[in-house]
């Protein structure tokens, strides 16, 4: 089904996803079948069918499948980064438009087991302004730019919840 003709907001999609059963079906977001399908919902249902999972029947189930799968993939990537980093990773920062998706950010915190700090949503524009501020002498280094941003723009922090359920889903999905 093509959702482009549906008139609905992202808030409605997120609300529908939040109301659905957790971990009903999961996908590998990096699978080649999701690179550029003509119909993403069809690609997801075919993937679930091929992997012996429950097939999403409602729009909210499809959205929840996507969000949960992304959050679990972020965990896998974070584990890889931790194995390469000499420093501990204790917080994940989400910037840009995705920082406005409360459900995905909460799922991400749940899946990775550390706080997620979301914002700013207009990171590209703010970065441009910060470079201009540095050129004008208003900020002298990256630390100064971060302090200025933190004083000027509200950020939202998501604490991990239900981590045992997310750990179990991660083990099944691996």
What are the language-model segments listed below?
Residues 5-92, 100-124, 130-174:
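Active-site core segments that coordinate phosphate-bearing ligands/cofactors
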